[in-house]
């Protein structure tokens, strides 16, 4: 009886999470439509389509010494990149990761940026001899800042709000570049912030440096976002003179995309309702690493309560939100042992579910597969939407298009990555697929910042 009830839960999940190619094409078309609406006017779409003010991407010919600062969570990274022009590319690079003391994450703006500038100063001071800048030229820094900002130029942006574990009230509404610049002056650090970017723009820049056919940078990690190169004359909301390059990098903020075509289940609806931002970031909640483990946990809880298939267990761990994380479901999903030993271990260690039969473990793997496959297929539909907007989804003009993807989910969850890539091929068709490539762009957010500083270099 328990097995029949359990199978009902899984069958319903399978049906509700189905992503046939026809539905995915509708999702891709909806994404392209929202992109157009967001470019039309401010607030015209749930997808913000923010101007990054980056109109020049690296070409691979840049040379000199450039710095990057990457702040997006409880750690930040500082890095130095020595570029050797088109023949040598990156001659060498060094980086250091620094933990931010917790009290600074809710202190004042000057304390946080003072600490960051101090660490940056130490990093710069430890350089070898012979790396002085020529003719008293200032050192150039690219700043990756992965929090919501409103930009008005390539090197300025006011903080809209903090996310993650930060709550520094006096920084909200302030220009984060000016705050950093002031802190660097106080440290006696002769450095100029050449560009303020986010991790998606950094991924695009880092990949473009090596390959001029890269058209978009996409993040599938804890969260998700995308940035791509748009023709400046295709942005009706652009005010002022068009850039000489004729291009503009758009930071899509596509995590907030929504369409009635998205296959949303009761588990997604409950997760959204209980989240800090109900009704927001629906696409992100279906496709990113922050949420996949949590969706699976909710399914397993229903399975336990409705069918009793796990026996008389204490459901307290199974009832704890975010207790099951995406790396756990990835480990279970990739379990290739004949008796699914890893699945048994994870269920026991994390959820205190013991004595499972092989049939039950297979059911758990199937649930992981349904949730991860839906995420990967919807992720591919988003990428197809960008290609559709750019007219690169298989028209007559089959120029090569490369999508650079970074983020832990894409990098470490093999079945997610493989499913995304094969689904993109399915949506584009055999002919168009020949001219589209997906590349893993490792560490875009760090090195990308330094490379954009180089491409903006005066």
UniProtKB/Swiss-Prot annotation:
Boundaries of every Hexokinase domain copy: 4-454
- GO BP: any one term: glucose metabolic process
Q: Which UniProt keywords apply?
A: ATP-binding, Glycolysis, Kinase, Nucleotide-binding, Transferase
Q: Which domain of life is it from?
A: Eukaryota
One term of GO molecular function: D-glucose binding
Q: Which residues bind ADP?
A: 73-75, 222, 408
Annotated spans, Hexokinase large subdomain: 198-443
Kindly name one Pfam family recorded for this protein.
Answer: Hexokinase_1
Tissue distribution is: Expressed in roots, leaves, flowers, immature seeds, endosperm and seed coat.
* Reactions it catalyzes: a D-hexose + ATP = a D-hexose 6-phosphate + ADP + H(+); D-fructose + ATP = D-fructose 6-phosphate + ADP + H(+); D-glucose + ATP = D-glucose 6-phosphate + ADP + H(+)
Q: What's the EC number here?
A: 2.7.1.1
Report the InterPro entries cross-referenced here: ATPase_NBD, Hexokinase, Hexokinase_C, Hexokinase_N
Q: What class of enzyme is it?
A: transferase
Q: Which residues bind D-glucose?
A: 163-164, 198-199, 225, 253, 284
Name the pathway: Carbohydrate metabolism; hexose metabolism; Carbohydrate degradation; glycolysis; D-glyceraldehyde 3-phosphate and glycerone phosphate from D-glucose: step 1/4
Q: Which PROSITE patterns match?
A: HEXOKINASE_2 (PS51748)
Choose one Gene Ontology CC annotation of this protein and give it: cytosol
Q: Which family does it belong to?
A: Belongs to the hexokinase family.
Q: What is this protein called?
A: Hexokinase-8
User: Could you tell me which species this protein originates from?
Assistant: Oryza sativa subsp. japonica
Originating gene = HXK8
